[in-house]
Swiss-Prot record:
Transmembrane segments: 40-60, 70-90, 139-159, 209-229, 270-290, 306-326, 366-386
Single GO cellular component term: plasma membrane
Assembly and binders: Interacts with Orco. Complexes exist early in the endomembrane system in olfactory sensory neurons (OSNs), coupling these complexes to the conserved ciliary trafficking pathway.
Assigned protein family: Belongs to the insect chemoreceptor superfamily. Heteromeric odorant receptor channel (TC 1.A.69) family. Or49a subfamily.
InterPro entries found in the cross-reference section: 7tm6_olfct_rcpt
Protein name: Putative odorant receptor 69a, isoform B
Topology in membrane: Multi-pass membrane protein
Tissue/organ expression: Expressed in olfactory sensory neurons in the antenna.
Record's subcellular location: Cell membrane
Keyword tRNA-binding: no
UniProt keyword Membrane present: yes
Organism field: Drosophila melanogaster (Fruit fly)
MF annotations from Gene Ontology: ionotropic olfactory receptor activity; odorant binding; olfactory receptor activity
Topological region Cytoplasmic: 1-39, 91-138, 230-269, 327-365
Amino acid sequence: MQLEDFMRYPDLVCQAAQLPRYTWNGRRSLEVKRNLAKRIIFWLGAVNLVYHNIGCVMYGYFGDGRTKDPIAYLAELASVASMLGFTIVGTLNLWKMLSLKTHFENLLNEFEELFQLIKHRAYRIHHYQEKYTRHIRNTFIFHTSAVVYYNSLPILLMIREHFSNSQQLGYRIQSNTWYPWQVQGSIPGFFAAVACQIFSCQTNMCVNMFIQFLINFFGIQLEIHFDGLARQLETIDARNPHAKDQLKYLIVYHTKLLNLADRVNRSFNFTFLISLSVSMISNCFLAFSMTMFDFGTSLKHLLGLLLFITYNFSMCRSGTHLILTSGKVLPAAFYNNWYEGDLVYRRMLLILMMRATKPYMWKTYKLAPVSITTYMATLKFSYQMFTCVRSLK
């Protein structure tokens, strides 16, 4: 098994939106140069994603609520605000993916070096690889299904209106966005807006999935190493003449893992903060919009709500598993037969135990930990906001 095997799905989402693929020393498959057509697809998606932010703001600015029911108008604004949350997260993730490409590739180089050292040892690589692949495969299938439904909904609604002998077509695009051309009442303008949002949605979903998978990738690699470190600590025989050398190696190994985990944390600090804070507000708006529209549109908002929930759950799940796995180091050191070692061995083991007193956890700028506890707190806050807004009806 190679480190590259863990990057199957991240590479797949890069290919879907023609995003630049990450490379590092030791990767077997070489980087495929994108031709002109692929670069055009990428830039169409990126430009439309950036414009989508502007279009949502302009739609809210130009919207006239005087001719509508106040509650319906509020639901429409909530729908626009929730979509703006999606595009903000996607745009920032795209910026991070491109601007920190070299930094992430350097991290991948270091994880590759560590992986080459352990792949022939008794590490549970296959166990963690299966767990990781199963999780992101299910996430990939759900996101793909959501994208297909989201982008096909305008066409399906127009076909239904056409065959139901409706006197006037709705011309409803994927999300309420302002465009500098006529959309309502214009077939070419309608399909142009739908095409723009298809490119925007494709890039948005692929970038968000890539960042989500990359966080899970780094998390599962750290889990493999912390688990292997704990298992090696348990098997050290303090009576062995080479025990001090083995323990010294593990102390250096543990220090390197903590440094790598800190670098990963610093790389995703902004992502953690934006994702958790934006999702709290967007979940409230999506839940409110879901209760105000027809079945097809409500299902679209339900999928959006589930996308935000699974996006944050995936990050917090990875952080929680890292906490649990890194927490194995201290018990492994304690239950080692240290009492049969000499004084130098005991002092060295004490150094490692002091560093492993608390399990390692990712944090958002040293504030809230990235864990299921924080995830549940964000859901609770979103629900409180939803009940408050819903009571206004």
